[in-house]
Amino acid sequence: NYFISNYPQYSFWQPEHVPQLISLLNSPPQDEPIPLGIYFHIPFCRKRCHFCYFRVYTDKNASEIKAYIDSGIKEIERYGQMPYLKGRKPKFIYFGGGTPSYLSVAQLTELTDRMKAVFPWDEAEEVAFECEPGTLTEKKLDRIRKLGVTRLSLGVENFNDHILEINGRAHRSKENIRSYNYAKVIGF
């Protein structure tokens, strides 16, 4: 058995595929284009869970996180200028990780404002956002909702504190319940 820790797998990409991809992106859609989805990866966490096999970073400061966000936005802006994607509105947005809710309210606002400037998602069917309950405050959940997020994945994993502890989770059951209850209050 093996796990996929990067998607698509590195073995998927072959040098001979690059010209075809560039050609597609540099051409306007011929027919009804395939619905557009955007995944933005946030590889930061408060701590590494014992079962996690993904590349995550637990020791990054605000300036390093800003540099990562800036690089991701630069890539989005580049793709947003390509004829195949220019002017399109995504059908779905997914913020995965790591832990997207690790970002501060200011970082989340900057990230999403800059993304929406390139790919507005006011008509998206779903905007999904992964969380770790211990990183959520009412202020942050309110902001996440106002940013247009329609679905939360709370990352509860378990309600037994002993199991959470032995799995290396940073949160405990009371944070699961608090986050869930407030998310329901504000319409998730």
Model-derived features: positions:
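Proline-rich low-complexity regions
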Residues: 8-10, 43, 100, 133
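Structural motif
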Residues: 36-37, 92
